[in-house]
Amino acid sequence: MSVKKASFPELFDLVVVGAGHAGCEAAMASARLGLKTLLLTINADRIGHLSCNPAIGGLAKGHMVKEIDALGGMMGLWADEAGIQFRLLNTSKGPAVHSTRAQIDRDAYMKAVQRDVFRQDNLWVWQDTAENVLVENGRAAGVSTLLGQEFRSRAVCVTAGTFMSGLIHVGLTHFSGGRLGDPAAQGLSASLRAVGLELGRLKTGTTPRLLRDSINFDVMVEQPGDNPPRPFSFRSRHARMPQVPCYLTWTNEATHEAIRAGFDRSPMFTGIISGTGARYCPSIEDKIARFPDKDRHQIFIEPEGLHSPEVYPGGIPTSLPLDVQKAMIATIPGLEKAQIVRPGYAIEYDYANPTQLKPTLETKVLPGLWMAGQVNGTSGYEEAAAQGLWAALNIFCGLRGLPAFIPGRDEAYMAVLVDDLVTKGTLEPYRMFTSRAEHRLLLRENNADSRLTPAGRSLGLVDDAQWQLYTAKKTALEQLLAELDARQVRPDAATRDIFVHMNEAVPTRSVSLADLLRRPALGITDLQAFGLETDGFAADVLEEAQTIVKYSGYLKRQEELVLRTARHESVVISEAADYAAVHGLTREAVEKLSKVRPRTLGQAARISGITPAALSCIEVYLKKNGWL
């Protein structure tokens, strides 16, 4: 039911704390599903802000944007509206790992997010700082704020990003902040500890921003986008904004010398920073220290927007002193006269190790309290948005008495993300890669809709327009696959000439178009020579049909593997299980199982140190207690 926004309700269904990518995705989904939702933010002017690089997508990340979209989420639509360059990455490899990445106009993206957030029925916004999670009768019951407000709710979702006790470092100068220009949330960490959560400390960083007009692009390598650009959303026909290039330059030995000269004033090397940094997004000073033999590092000059005076030099995040940053920049080809508009900096912040969460992202220690996004130890906009949507769907299911939304690792990258987090935890910022998904052949960007849109529809987040697009594509794909299987090509004189012209062996018997498509050198459009009409099919339908046919053998083996492992995934472990009472388990196994409290035997198997023998012991215990 839609509720127009008048005065604030006395009782919200959900309070979302933080309006970054996790918070906006969670709040929009919750409100669209009919839950009365409050989005609480430290700065309403920065709702949906891209705090680091002006880009969305990338390897495995593009898959998650597509999955968010397939479920009815928003990130793909917002990215398509603000995208100023789109590229499909990994095209030299198989289609399973092709990933979309878009440069984003930072202001246009934020405006799109804020427009939808402020217009959305059932969704209220309040600028303030969350100080405490309210608890009543052993459940989260709302939040209180720095301004003394209390917002009562049936559920709370903390999506605080880097804001919990955030500490910013530029050289040996450090000060409180959630990001440069915004205050930190100082009280929330203590409140979360008070309800029983254990918090750790992580670190991330960003690059200095440069004045566009002070850069010499002529000595750099231009990096154009794809033409035509391919949007993220299954609901988008095309990109909306003019497309612009990026540029590539490199560091050199003079750059590295300038950086080394500042090591003695680096907060990372002097021990001032205690938080663990991102392994896969290291600072430039870390790269120089760890790889002294490498004579240069790439720097991608990324536009901040069509009309922005700033650019983002991707590849040189740093927390070195400002004078060192200036000296470093001045040695880079094309940046000799570049002016720094904003310094690069590192930020430390509190996070909750996600083994303290259920697979729904609800905390184990306090019912009604959910956590999503960077506060769970992840890095990246896309990982955050995926968690925000996941949490919102499960909050909706919980409040409505529906089964939890927990797809398997063979169904979604976001499922791999959440399962890794709640099962293994993380002591460093977690980033998604295609290599983390053991069933990645089944998890292609192009089939995200067939994997997840029916689930989004059944939950109520996929609207009629999106459902019609999905069913039309599904019908067209089924029609095309049927035609490829049914239509036969005979080795007669006419077809023989076609095969010879294509440099292909002539078959000795009649073969289907699908059989021909399995030949490595032939693509689906080549089959037009044999009478296949492709003009009536959209490009994504043709591409998906080609993938399904060409990789049918591999896909079948992958599906068989999923079936073989499905038995463990279907064995649910009772919440009442006492691992100390399981005969045959080692002390290590008891400790890890008691901490994670896996939902299924399959999840238990993915905990480090849990052997097949331990799984057998658990299964015997479950049967003995009548839980199997």
Curated annotation (Swiss-Prot):
InterPro entries: FAD/NAD-bd_sf, GIDA_C_N, MnmG, MnmG-rel, MnmG-rel_CS, MnmG_C, MnmG_C_subdom, MnmG_C_subdom_sf. GO terms for molecular function: flavin adenine dinucleotide binding. FAD binds at G18, A19, G20, H21, A22, G23. It is found in: Cytoplasm. Keywords: Cytoplasm, FAD, Flavoprotein, NAD, tRNA processing. Coiled coil: none annotated. Its cofactor is FAD. NAD(+) binds at residues 277-291. Pfam families: GIDA, GIDA_C_1st, SAM_GIDA_C. One of its GO terms (cellular component) is cytosol. The keyword Flavoprotein applies. The keyword Cell wall biogenesis/degradation does not apply. GO terms for biological process: tRNA methylation; tRNA wobble uridine modification. Its main location: cytoplasm. Homodimer. Heterotetramer of two MnmE and two MnmG subunits. HAMAP family: MnmG_GidA. Belongs to the MnmG family. NAD-binding protein involved in the addition of a carboxymethylaminomethyl (cmnm) group at the wobble position (U34) of certain tRNAs, forming tRNA-cmnm(5)s(2)U34. NCBIfam families: mnmG_gidA (TIGR00136). This is tRNA uridine 5-carboxymethylaminomethyl modification enzyme MnmG.
